[in-house]
Amino acid sequence: CLGCMTFGEPDRGNHAWTLPEESSRPIIKRALEGGINFFDTANSYSDGSSEEIVGRALRDFARREDVVVATKVFHRVGDLPEGLSRAQILRSIDDSLRRLGMDYVDILQIHRWDYNTPIEETLEALNDVVKAGKARYIGASSMHASQFAQALKLQKQHGWAQFISMQDHYNLIYREEEREMLPLCYQEGVAVIRSEEHTSEL
């Protein structure tokens, strides 16, 4: 999985260290040539420009059916406020698909746990996104194991689309996820995507 937080116009968003499109495209092309076919971005990376750059590069260098594209929803982008309400999720996926230039994403991930929105509202909206064909699967990121377990239980109870992946902070130094999150994911058959924001998830 190639984390795409590094790709984005430096004058957009909060990270002036990101690579603009002309510098990002050769890296994405080389990654594809090297066999990498999973690209993970987010609606908030560089105010949406990461999705734009990744989408254009993949259209030019790969066939859609040969790549896995994941994006995320939660953080504020433009006039879209932070959160995981139904309205925010439905608008965010449409905005992401427009920026990516795609009809669907393979995985739509919730970037954080939203303490201001009932989790049932979030999960039902995600289920509707899957039913509409705008995301094939859904994933989660950056939350406590107890929260993830609660969400998985509710999805089973209501027959909603279930999370198939968890992206959490995990590396050789920070191994807290081995205590609860990784055993939970193993038990539930959930794939783990290692996230290390300071190294752009690579």
Predicted feature descriptions by range:
Residues 52-63, 92-98, 180-189:
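Short amphipathic alpha-helices and their capping/turn segments at secondary-structure boundaries
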Residues 35, 101-104, 109, 134, ...:
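Short loop/turn motifs at secondary-structure junctions
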Residues 17-31, 82-101, 121, 148-153:
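Short, acidic/polar
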Residues 1-67, 103, 131:
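N-terminal binding-site loop/beta-alpha segment at the start of enzyme catalytic domains
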Residues 114-200:
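Beta/alpha (TIM)-barrel catalytic core signal, keyed to glycine-rich beta->alpha loops juxtaposed to Asp/Glu
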Residues 8-22, 75-90, 111-117:
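Active-site mouth loops of central-metabolism enzymes
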Residues 5-7, 42-44, 72-76, 110-113, ...:
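Active-site beta-loop-alpha junctions enriched in small/polar residues
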